[in-house]
């Protein structure tokens, strides 16, 4: 079977698809991946045959992909739900296709077109956090979210007797002001901090803070006591999968909805932009780490739920039947 994956050309939209794409390749199928060149290096490293449709840079339009569909003649197309172009191209060509999610559906303010519900959806969100209307109306294929990150040479986590917290604002929402405020609050609470600052330059930081441009998030998460982040779906699901409580500092897109869902579930606390200060961060992280708050227990319960979801390997073995639905 020949399977074509497609995503927007960003880490947050491409990385969630890589575990399933790799599992499909390891199951003996031929895999190709349509995306802009920004993410080709990671796709090449995983043997996923990336290519850039036409002149597409970030988003892929149906007209960009149609010549490649004629060339490759895939049996199945799997595309993230932020990409409507591949869905349209697949429909025109009569090729079965599946939506691949990356979190809760359908978040307000994310700026993406909602997919139609007439085709199956690979759902990586644990049911307890998923939108109840979506659960009731969509044809879902449960898929365990598996964190993917690029390995870094000589990476290691050093623990002390103090709590360790991972701080990130993702690839698109980082600002020096928010990161600095969070660092001030975390260090005031007596916490060691690992920061993934992206392209933000922070200058001098306290001795108990380690700043990196990027970290191998999937390798780091099992070792931390809490995650302080923007509420992006990748970090949210990655932390939940290992049972780590979260402090969410939402900045935009789907992050406010994620913060609300996590707070209701008891696995997180959140601080809105207008309420963010070093004091509010320190107070919140103390509550988060306190056994009396129950946040770790709630996060671990969701981790157990995620562990029961079908793995990428299990889902990959079942994909051929969806290709037969022509």
Task: Outline where the language-model segments fall.
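Glycosyltransferase specificity loop/lid
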Residues: 1-104, 177, 181, 187-326
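A nucleotide-sugar donor-handling region in carbohydrate enzymes
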Residues: 36, 40, 109-164, 168-173, ...
């Amino acid at each position: 079977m020949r399977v074509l994956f497609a995503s927007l050309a960003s880490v947050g939209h491409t990385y969630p698809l890589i575990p399933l794409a790799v599992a499909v390749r390891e199951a003996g199928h031929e895999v190709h991946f349509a995306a802009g060149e920004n993410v080709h290096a990671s796709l090449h490293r995983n043997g996923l045959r990336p290519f850039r449709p036409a002149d597409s840079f970030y988003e892929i339009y149906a007209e960009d992909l149609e010549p490649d569909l004629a060339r490759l003649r895939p049996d199945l197309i799997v595309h993230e739900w932020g990409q409507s172009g591949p869905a349209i191209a697949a429909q025109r060509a009569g090729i079965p296709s599946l939506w691949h999610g990356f979190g809760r559906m359908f978040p307000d303010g994310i700026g993406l077109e909602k997919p139609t519900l007439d085709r199956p959806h690979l759902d990586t969100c644990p049911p307890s956090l998923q939108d109840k209307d979506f659960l009731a109306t969509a044809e879902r294929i449960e898929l365990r979210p598996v964190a993917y990150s690029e390995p870094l040479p000589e990476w290691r986590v050093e623990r002390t007797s103090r709590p360790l917290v991972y701080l990130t604002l993702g690839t698109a929402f980082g600002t020096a002001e928010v990161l600095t405020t969070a660092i001030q609050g975390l260090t005031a609470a007596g916490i060691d901090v690992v920061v993934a600052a992206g392209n933000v330059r922070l200058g001098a930081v306290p001795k108990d803070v380690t700043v990196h441009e990027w970290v191998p998030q999937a390798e780091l998460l099992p070792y931390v006591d809490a995650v302080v982040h923007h509420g992006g779906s990748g970090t949210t699901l990655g932390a939940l999968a290992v049972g780590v409580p979260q402090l969410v500092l939402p900045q935009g897109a789907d992050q406010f909805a994620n913060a609300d869902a996590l707070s209701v579930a008891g696995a997180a606390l959140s601080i809105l932009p207008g309420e963010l200060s070093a004091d509010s961060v320190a107070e919140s992280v103390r509550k988060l780490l306190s056994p009396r708050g129950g946040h770790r227990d709630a996060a671990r319960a969701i981790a157990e739920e995620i562990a029961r979801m079908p793995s990428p390997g299990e889902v990959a073995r079942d994909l051929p039947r969806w290709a037969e639905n022509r």
